Amino acid sequence: MKLLLLAALLTAGAAAHSISPRAVWQFRNMIKCTIPGSDPLKDYNNYGCYCGLGGWGTPVDDLDRCCQTHDHCYSQAKKLESCKFLIDNPYTNTYSYSCSGSEITCSAKNNKCEDFICNCDREAAICFSKVPYNKEYKNLDTGKFC
């Protein structure tokens, strides 16, 4: 019985740490709100040292710093008392927001954790819209340059 319980907990933990397509889609749509016509999943994944999964080293430019700040924001979310481990992981939790023009508003209906994560994504999307995109940092050899 203990082995069955352990297996169930490990499976739940592994599932909670996988990235939810819906959560990624929300962040993508926020970026599209601030940068209409962009292709966020193509453009910003594997950019510099921090944009995409993981991140380490020194950011290569301002856009990469936006991603580093976003990563740190997610790390802070995981430490919040209102964000319950397994349930409110920033990579899996979804939230409510609206986009009007290029303005993003996180919904008052969000709980504290959802609001924090929403604002992490909102601030990153705004940051992306204010800095240049340097094609030479797309698919950067992170082992060499980070």
Curated annotation (Swiss-Prot):
Activated by trypsin cleavage in the duodenum. Can also be activated by thrombin or autocatalytically. Its main location: secreted. GO terms for cellular component: cell surface; extracellular region; extracellular space. Ca(2+) binds at Y50, G52, G54, D71. Its EC number is 3.1.1.4. GO terms for biological process: antibacterial humoral response; antimicrobial humoral immune response mediated by antimicrobial peptide; arachidonate secretion; defense response to Gram-positive bacterium; fatty acid biosynthetic process; innate immune response in mucosa; phosphatidylcholine metabolic process; phosphatidylglycerol metabolic process. Disulfide bonds join C33-C99, C49-C146, C51-C67, C66-C127, C73-C120, C83-C113, C106-C118. The active site is at H70, D121. Keywords: Autocatalytic cleavage, Calcium, Disulfide bond, Hydrolase, Lipid metabolism, Metal-binding, Phospholipid metabolism, Secreted, Signal, Zymogen. InterPro entries: PLipase_A2 (IPR001211), PLipase_A2_Asp_AS (IPR033112), PLipase_A2_dom (IPR016090), PLipase_A2_dom_sf (IPR036444), PLipase_A2_His_AS (IPR033113). Binds 1 Ca(2+) ion per subunit. Residues 1-15 form the signal peptide. One of its GO terms (molecular function) is calcium-dependent phospholipase A2 activity. Induction: Up-regulated in EPCAM-positive intestinal epithelial cell upon helminth infection. Up-regulated in intestinal epithelial organoids in response to stimulation with T-helper type 2 cytokines IL4 and IL13. It catalyses: a 1,2-diacyl-sn-glycero-3-phosphocholine + H2O = a 1-acyl-sn-glycero-3-phosphocholine + a fatty acid + H(+); 1,2-ditetradecanoyl-sn-glycero-3-phosphocholine + H2O = 1-tetradecanoyl-sn-glycero-3-phosphocholine + tetradecanoate + H(+); 1,2-dihexadecanoyl-sn-glycero-3-phosphocholine + H2O = 1-hexadecanoyl-sn-glycero-3-phosphocholine + hexadecanoate + H(+); 1-hexadecanoyl-2-(9Z-octadecenoyl)-sn-glycero-3-phosphocholine + H2O = 1-hexadecanoyl-sn-glycero-3-phosphocholine + (9Z)-octadecenoate + H(+). Disruption phenotype: Mutant mice are susceptible to H.polygyrus and N.brasiliensis infection, failing to expel larvae and retaining a sustained infection. In response to high fat diet, mutant mice are resistant to hyperlipidemia associated with reduced hepatic very low density lipoprotein production and increased triglyceride-rich lipoprotein clearance. Expressed in pancreas, liver, lung and spleen. Expressed in EPCAM-positive intestinal epithelial cell (at protein level). It comes from the Eukaryota. It is found in: Secreted. Residues 16-22 form a propeptide. Its cofactor is Ca(2+). Monomer or homodimer. Interacts with PLA2R1; this interaction mediates intracellular signaling as well as clearance of extracellular PLA2G1B via endocytotic pathway. Belongs to the phospholipase A2 family. Secretory calcium-dependent phospholipase A2 that primarily targets dietary phospholipids in the intestinal tract. Hydrolyzes the ester bond of the fatty acyl group attached at sn-2 position of phospholipids (phospholipase A2 activity) with preference for phosphatidylethanolamines and phosphatidylglycerols over phosphatidylcholines. May play a role in the biosynthesis of N-acyl ethanolamines that regulate energy metabolism and inflammation in the intestinal tract. This is Phospholipase A2. It comes from Mus musculus.
